Amino acid sequence: MNKTLKFNAPATCFEESLLLGNGFLGAAVYGGIEVERYSMNEATLWTGFPKDAPNPDGKEALKKAQGLIADGKHTEAAEVLEQGFSGDFSQTYLPLCSIYIDCGITEYDTYSRTLDMEKGVLKVNYTDGDTSVSRESFISNPHRVMVVKIKQTGVPLTQIYIKSELYHCVFTHEDKLILRGTAPYYDHPTGRRYFTNKHPFYYEDDAKKGMKYKGVLKVEHNGELRFNGDIMEILNADEITVYFAAKTSFNGFEKHPYLEGAEIENAVDEILQKAINKGYNALKKAHIDDFSSLFGRTDFSLRNNKTDLYTDKILKEHKSNALYELLFNVGKYLTISASREGGQAMNLQGIWNEHIAPPWNSNYTININTEMNYMPTTALNLPECFEPYVKFAEELAINGRKIAEEWYGVKGVISHHNSDIWRIANPVGNKCKGTHVWSFYNTSFGWILWGLVEKFRMENDVEYLKNTLYPLLTECAETYIALFTEDEKGNLYLSPATSPENQFILEDGTPIGIAKYSAMNNAICRDILKSAVEFAEILGDDANCQRYKKYLEKIMPYEITSDGRILEWDKEYTEQDIHHRHVSHLYGLHPAREITPYSTPELAKAAKTSLNVRGDEGTGWCIAWKANMWARLFDGNRALKLLDNQLTFVKPNENKNISILSGGTYPNMLCAHPPFQIDGNFGATSAIIEMLVQCNGNDIYILPALPDKWESGEIKGIRINGGAFIDIKWEKGKKADVKITPEEKAHNYNLIFKH
């Protein structure tokens, strides 16, 4: 039951820092000796503003590409898509600022830095002779403010200041530090980033100005306050309480943040003053009550979990089951800290980014990454944390309808590889060569809906099904139906098709990323139509139910390669990378439940062969995805091997290049792509749940993929299908005690013990 991250030295980089958040504000806290740093984010601070994505020639380009693919002219089809069926790139998630607290101490005798994940409270304590400093920090969701309590002895001067890489100013007013600024209008005219003195483009024209932002810092203290320029100085204080609040002018994904932005001047001041009026003790209690009420809904523990080591040492030695408990709890902690009701969905880095030009813009990559962020959320019984994802899907659908009609010429909703806070749904690429491999992926909305489908199956909320899920699901189904191509045998498929980011080699040696159809697209179409049939029956929509069944029966079936694998494309091409990180052709195994060892044994065997050929290496999220897949194949030892690969210690800054084979975990337990990418943390938590309990309809599989190493343990509070919760306690890998706590709408269950 390891729920604390602890270190005996300050962080030297982001990958060693400890994270705080409330779904709106995020902080990476370094625990510095001389100078403490809080690297701050505000979840709505992005470049740019909403823009239309017109493409009057898109329909003709698509039709031409379809004809070329049908004739086997892959290279020509790819060029048509890149030149005639691509639009602007996504915008960028930005850092807000860094808050520095300088107490002038340069050495220490003792030091501890801990994050209590159960309470969401971070503590830093250190001494140097008779001098001591203690800092306690949290970010409150109920009060939308960061609070830092400093207790110190022997510190004559404490300085507090704010810096930002964005266009900004910091000034003082009464007893406050005030940060104001404007985000850049940040365009990718050729897919490249342009900077002037490290800053992206800014414009004087109001119509091209980006988001406004404001942050206010105020202190309570028992010393003397003065200002030295824009530096706050507090003399001879042994107790200081720092309050910080921030907001942007973001006013919705369809409104210009500068011309139609939300009011922030008074809003930030009001948030801050309400928090200060509440007082530190009341704020802390409200925060802990809120945070622990979410964190405590589920629990996971294993025997042989004792350890007195610091977190980075546990990770390096990897001898105790404590590490798996930490992995589970970190995923849960990050979910609660980054995704809360009324906020934004988690991006590639959750809500934590300190780079003005982050990897992949820290955007929403929706060919797996955003979806993986929310894989465990519903099973963890965190509907408050899942709400931003539902809102993301609903907002994306609004722009997705425009793209379906204007680019494809059909009614419905469609999205592609990337999105951002402005909910772009168009294929990006901006006519750049080689982008078709990933940018044309056009079944992402179907995958996004998988998470919403799981929410209904687990919560059994018919009103949610009727008012939210079913309308989106049927729109998605209608899109695919309208876009289906039919072959001479009557099989239906989407064409052209990608298998995200993967390529094969043409006979002339050219790598290419589109084919007549792909296993992944077919699987998503099947999953969407199968769910549409299931839910049409529940809601009594008989006409659509029968219609969807007819299309469902005709979707191109799986094919097996000559060496026994799931065929990824329309034929057996020479693969460019047989160990490619994406295993998209196994979508039917996970996240969908179309391929299972009990219902489709031959396909399960082919999926297993596919995974063996792909191998156990990859990026952090790739390894986590494969762990989920091996759990679905009831191979707990192989799933654990993948988790062990993900738990490989990665030394920060050792290799600043992007890696597609390394994976691993940074000292602060964040997933390493490398670089940092948060999805693997959630994928790992999901895999642990899948190893211990799986649902398929009313069949509940108990310990379906229990590894030998987890001889005894317990998992509690996991939400299962039909609106119920399950606790499982097992001893010596065999005996299992199971408790199911139903809600009002719970089902009858068939319990199947697999171990």
Pin down the residues of each PLM region:
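Well-ordered alpha-helical segments within folded domains of soluble proteins
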Residues: 368-378, 442-453, 520-530, 584-593, ...
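Extended amphipathic alpha-helical segments enriched in small hydrophobics
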Residues: 462, 466-483, 526, 630-646
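Alpha-helix capping and helix-loop boundary segments enriched in small/acidic/polar residues
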Residues: 360-364, 377, 432-443, 459-471, ...
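C-terminal structured "cap/appendage" subdomains that terminate the fold
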Residues: 672-750
